[in-house]
């Protein structure tokens, strides 16, 4: 495995957002290359525990080099965190969950993973190459209308129908298997070019999100967090594009408001208690400073949102 450099975005801020207790139990739902996990471990005492999760086999290989009895790694999607926690009898005892969403720099920089239009490689895009359909397989079998919907929904691509038609026509002639081929087809089908962005940017994002069910993963993990967090436990979540951040922002806002009851609706105290109260308290958001963006341009679009589990 090549050693691709990865600079962890908002490292200190995300871990500080967890408000680490030395004897606490924490989850790093996106281990990656271990930047957040190592910092969390450095702040834990002997009684502390860190459960890390990743579905990328390369990340698992890195995690297995950490020889620390307080640390354990799980190969799987973070959407199943409630199951992992229940297996260890930690339900309701988790003091913090950190998620660093999206694709990592090592994944983007490794041409063999097929995430980037900047490097020619197999058209794969799977976070876990051992499971599910690759991007090439999906694009070769999907209907034109479905491809267009994915590009529009997950890439916010205004030329989605044109690009989908071009992809289907190209695959009919000769199936695409390389990232360079897809990038060229998209560029040729895009009538108006953005001088600041490669024409394939939105298509690659959309296909990657679809192949990995990324938004569903986020929604399920957020929902599960409410059942596993202890009162006062923290959520610290880094997003990299508007679709991710929209889901996180909406979830934290809704759970911070509690049940919405029409004004003037007659209710007994027992009925109000049955509805429950606020599940979370939103603690705000942070964005990278100029220095971090200058040192790591990929940090530019990142947003960190932090929330705390209430006693509800």
From Swiss-Prot:
GO molecular function: rRNA (cytosine-N4-)-methyltransferase activity
PANTHER family attached to this UniProt entry: 12S RRNA N4-METHYLCYTIDINE METHYLTRANSFERASE, S-ADENOSYL-METHYLTRANSFERASE MRAW
Gene3D superfamilies: Putative methyltransferase TM0872, insert domain (1.10.150.170), Vaccinia Virus protein VP39 (3.40.50.150)
HAMAP family, sorted: 16SrRNA_methyltr_H
Pfam family, one: Methyltransf_5
Domain of life: Bacteria
GO (cellular component) term, any one: cytoplasm
Location of this chain's protein in the cell: Cytoplasm
Chief location bin: cytoplasm
Family statement: Belongs to the methyltransferase superfamily. RsmH family.
Top-level enzyme category: transferase
Record has DNA damage as a keyword: no
Family matches, as InterPro entries: RsmH, SAM-dep_MeTrfase_MraW_recog, SAM-dependent_MTases_sf
GO biological process: rRNA base methylation
Binding site residues for S-adenosyl-L-methionine: 34-36, 54, 78, 100, 107
Transmembrane residue ranges: none
Catalytic function, reaction form: cytidine(1402) in 16S rRNA + S-adenosyl-L-methionine = N(4)-methylcytidine(1402) in 16S rRNA + S-adenosyl-L-homocysteine + H(+)
UniProt name for this protein: Ribosomal RNA small subunit methyltransferase H
């Amino acid at each position: 495995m090549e050693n691709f450099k990865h600079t962890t975005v908002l490292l200190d801020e995300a871990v500080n957002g967890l408000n680490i207790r030395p004897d606490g139990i924490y989850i790093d739902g996106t281990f990656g290359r271990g930047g957040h996990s190592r910092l969390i471990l450095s702040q834990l005492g002997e009684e502390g525990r860190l459960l890390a999760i990743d579905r990328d086999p390369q990340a698992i290989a890195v995690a297995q080099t950490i020889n620390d009895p307080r640390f354990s790694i799980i190969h799987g999607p973070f959407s199943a965190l409630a199951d992992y926690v229940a297996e260890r009898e930690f339900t309701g005892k988790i003091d913090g969950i950190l998620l660093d969403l999206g694709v990592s720099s090592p994944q983007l920089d490794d041409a063999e993973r097929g995430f980037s239009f900047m490097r020619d490689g197999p058209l794969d895009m799977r976070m876990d190459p051992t499971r599910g359909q690759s991007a090439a397989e999906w694009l070769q079998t999907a209907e034109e209308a479905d491809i267009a919907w994915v590009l529009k929904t997950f890439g916010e691509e205004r030329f989605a129908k044109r690009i989908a038609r071009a992809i289907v026509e190209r695959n009919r002639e000769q199936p695409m298997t390389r990232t360079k081929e897809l990038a060229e087809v998209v560029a040729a089908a895009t009538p108006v070019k953005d001088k600041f962005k490669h024409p394939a940017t939105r298509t690659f994002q959309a296909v990657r999100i679809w192949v990995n069910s990324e938004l569903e993963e986020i929604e399920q993990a957020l929902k599960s967090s409410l059942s596993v967090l202890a009162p006062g436990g923290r959520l610290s979540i880094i997003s990299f594009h508007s679709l991710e951040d929209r889901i996180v922002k909406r979830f934290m806002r809704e759970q911070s408001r509690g049940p919405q009851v029409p004004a003037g609706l007659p209710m007994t105290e027992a009925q109000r208690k049955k509805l429950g109260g606020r599940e979370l308290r939103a603690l705000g958001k942070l964005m990278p400073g100029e220095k971090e963006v200058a040192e790591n341009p990929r940090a530019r679009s990142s947003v960190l949102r932090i929330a705390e589990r209430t006693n509800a």
